[in-house]
């Protein structure tokens, strides 16, 4: 998600980037990055998601050009806001045996962190992320 913000800002000339950061921090509604991964034990693919919700702290980081700190804010905003990093999602998918270790590592931009998270068994908080829509309540 942080890379997405940098890509948006970098489209503009250097002299406009401060103004663009400010505007982006005010209007951003969220960022969802996704990739399709080969399933481990079944044909087909499964989606891995990185989800960022622009909290006041994240909006401030964008304004102050501290984009590199957004990743930490996403990690800590997981349980309350449903945010997740790609590595958190990959860890969960691996621990659920949805994807192989090779697939998880190939999709990760920080393989050392991913390996550490998998070894700790630390994935996504239950109910947060993974892009699953809630199951609709049955009518009575």
Where are these regions (language model features)?
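Short, flexible helix-loop junctions that flank or precede catalytic/ligand sites
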Residues: 1-140
